Amino acid sequence: MKEIRLILASQSPRRLEILRQIGFQPEVIVSGIEEHTEETIPERVVMDLSRQKAGNVAARLAASLMPVNDLAGRKSRTKAASDRETSGLEAADSRQEPAVVVLGADTVVCTGGRILGKPHSHEEAEEMLRLLQGRTHQVCSGVTLIELRSGRSLTFAEKTEVEVAPMTNKEIHDYAYSAEPMDKAGGYGIQGFFGRYIAGIRGDYTNVVGLPAGAVYQSLKQLFREGQR
């Protein structure tokens, strides 16, 4: 896969760390969208929101790069015939520049027909944990990749099943009122203190943390394979 400049359209420190663990050094540009979707099926919800996030950042980046591209185009059109060979070499060099890819992602937890996002209060976190304890739920992440120069894009969803052990009322309350749940879908972080309550997992662990690492890497490869056809 060619060298890429990866832009993460998320302020999640966990997604940033996952991308670093698999060899990328992303830049972070947070999307400014109000998260809203008309979708109701979990996979479609997260794919739609990931498209919105990535699209917002990609549009802002494209707008900021437009004057530079226009200037380069004007210069190339005014070159003398004697410079054409040199221009060809410069164009070849420019094609070796890293591709700019924007990555947007969204994650939800699903249980009993309900979609759980991030809790807005400790009380809501406690309610979520009561729904999750003692049973199996699904974590669903949507990811969108947009290659800025070509406009090619790819969106997918990844689902992981997580089994939570039975918890006492005190365990639920103590965890819900800690600092951990507030910025996490479903009100828990598998990579933190809540790990002691995980009874089993089926699927990609990193997906539960916030970004399916393997699927992201394979999808990046697919994005550039399609661009070579």
Where are these regions (language model features)?
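Cofactor-binding loop segments of dinucleotide-utilizing enzymes, especially the Rossmann-like FAD-
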Residues: 11, 31, 148
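Anionic-ligand binding patches
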Residues: 2-7, 41-229
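Catalytic helix-loop patch of NAD(P)-dependent Rossmann-fold dehydrogenases
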Residues: 38
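N-terminal beta1-alpha1 ligand-phosphate binding loop
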Residues: 2-24
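A generic short alpha-helical patch detector that favors 3-5-residue windows
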Residues: 24-25, 189
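Active-site regions of enzymes building and remodeling cell-envelope glycoconjugates
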Residues: 25-26, 43
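A short beta-strand-loop structural module common to alpha/beta enzyme folds
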Residues: 27-35
